[in-house]
């Protein structure tokens, strides 16, 4: 068998202008995804065997991972920019259009949690979002994102969209890296580990707000809630599984691109804070102004108390947000 004409390093230089490896996917110079990368590389004539291709891919990823580019925009965005607006095929309010706009742009370190009562249309809205992303999503919950092996199944997906949250025993360090697009080690099965930036948008759907640690201010800055608490009268049970036409989806994106995104996060601030404190033990025992009283009340309610320093931090935050009335406490102490 003849020897390879080029070293892997030389091949990396040759292909650096022809292909791009971005977060688990391969693209050509026209930003078109290469679905069958092994066949694509073999057809170029630079490789003798399939094993040469495998070695080159590992070398290319390791050589250029630190310079990894951002994903090109979804083609549906460009289509939507040039289409005429028509009435929406499904009623979407301003906040829902803002969420679609943000998820498509994904230019800030935020993940959305959709919560609310059953029968309010949550599943239908999540179904629309998945289809806008051409079903290029992975149904991973927060627990699975904390695991390096299940995390690998989400690499190369543009959207993480799960109907489960599962916020127990989280690796917050890993999650912060994921949500802030920092390099993270990916451990795919039957392949070498490599570093990549997790570039997916995140959208989770649950009936009840999860218990999240308010002392982790870094994570709190990255969370926005959207509540849907109004039940739909006479709902169509097939809507959460309906397959929308491509034309309808382009029109939805066109409407989302038209929405005013000025100071858009402030529109979700109140419901986000309400959801963050709803299951918090400090809020549930907010009438107790001393730690010892708070810890005792937690035991009576079957809640796990924070440590005293963390209790003080959370309590200060709840005072700042207006969920604890310090003036009322002072008045009661004076009586």
Predicted regions span which residues?
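N-terminal accessory nucleic-acid engagement/regulatory domains that precede
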Residues: 2-76
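Feature primarily recognizes SF3-like P-loop helicase cores of small DNA viruses
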Residues: 53-57, 67-88, 94-120, 124-335
